[in-house]
Amino acid sequence: MDNQLIALPTVAELFSDNIQDAYKSEQLNHLLNQEPNQNWVKVHPFINNHKYLPIDKVEFLLRKIFKQYRIEVLHTGMLLNAVQVTVRVHYLNPVTGTMEFHDGVGACELQTKQGTGNLQMDMSNINKGAVTMALPIAKTFAVKDACDHFGKLFGSDLNRKDTVSFTPDEK
């Protein structure tokens, strides 16, 4: 195989039968790949230099951009000393008018009684209400993980060092 560059098709060429939808999709992708409002970005109090968007901002963006969305909990369970949640974020694609989805996962450690160390296999040292506290937090992490797939606006690149800038096709 020789070292010739193969020209990739443009979005317009891929969607030649419906160029208006292709243009709208590019515009949506351009919007979703803008940097988030820096006033919204927070630094995690316990994880060194870890940036994140609070869930209220993520939910605001879902409502504002997609108009219709819903969260489906696919799975909850135990993962070592934590609870885990898998969610599916359903959203109305504003370009196609179809419902689509992204999946996400999240986990949160169970709080244990002071001085007892890690969670014991019989779970005798978990605090009362530990699951009640941890499960919604894990769900929040899962929703935010699913929404990362939308792009930078939802915080996908906040903790990445090497990123590629999105540039919409001109034609």
Indicate where each model-derived feature is located.
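N-terminal, Lys/Arg- and Ser/Thr-rich interaction peptides
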Residues: 1-55
